[in-house]
Amino acid sequence: MSQQQQFKYIVRLFGQDVDGTMKVPYALAMVKGIGYNTARAIVFKLGLDKDRRLGELSDEDIKKIENYLTDKKILEVPNWMYNRRKDYESGIDMHLVTSDLIFYVRNDIEREKKIKSWRGVRHSLGLKVRGQRTRTTGRTGVTVGVRRSKAAQAAQQQQKAQASSGGEKKQG
């Protein structure tokens, strides 16, 4: 087969469709849970060319990438690169991708709500959690405009009436 026939424009990676025309690190970064730095580390550890397109990789290379994360072989990188260090239940360092990451984060938030920690209370109230200011930013709901009092409206109408009547006298 020639190179043109082997090129895949859409590659299935971690149960997600990824653009095959992108370079390998950038294409890996499109998967939820894998950032650019993690993608570069994976490419380096597996000995892949970072300048190749994802669609040019063989099926074995793609399986190698998937197995690298699922078989916990990512342990070869420093622990600060994991996206889930010292798991609450097991105590081990993990790197989660796609639906696993979403599931664990959702469970963490529900656990914090259940034990009524500060973060859990903030989550349950729909407020900011990480110490940001909330006086002016992060407002939700319908904006309420400023309404004038009836006295202010009457005074404004009176001024308009005086201005219009005063203008007519000058002309006449």
UniProtKB/Swiss-Prot annotation:
Q: Which GO terms describe its cellular component?
A: cytosol; small ribosomal subunit
Keywords assigned by UniProt, alphabetized: Ribonucleoprotein, Ribosomal protein, RNA-binding, rRNA-binding
| GO terms for MF | rRNA binding; structural constituent of ribosome
For the biological process aspect of GO, one term held by this record is: translation
Q: Which SUPFAM superfamilies match?
A: S13-like H2TH domain
Where does the record place the region Disordered? 131-172
Q: Does the keyword rRNA-binding apply?
A: yes
Q: What's the domain of life for this entry?
A: Archaea
> Where are the compositionally biased (Low complexity) regions?
134-163
Q: Does the keyword RNA-binding apply?
A: yes
Give the protein family.
Belongs to the universal ribosomal protein uS13 family.
Report quaternary structure and partners.
Part of the 30S ribosomal subunit. Forms a loose heterodimer with protein S19. Forms two bridges to the 50S subunit in the 70S ribosome.
Under NCBIfam families, the record lists:
PRK04053.1 (NF003140), uS13_arch (TIGR03629)
Q: Per its UniProt record, what HAMAP family does this chain match? A: Ribosomal_uS13
The record describes the protein's role as: Located at the top of the head of the 30S subunit, it contacts several helices of the 16S rRNA. In the 70S ribosome it contacts the 23S rRNA (bridge B1a) and protein L5 of the 50S subunit (bridge B1b), connecting the 2 subunits; these bridges are implicated in subunit movement.
- This chain belongs to the protein called Small ribosomal subunit protein uS13
Name the source organism.
Sulfurisphaera tokodaii (strain DSM 16993 / JCM 10545 / NBRC 100140 / 7) (Sulfolobus tokodaii)
| The encoding gene | rps13
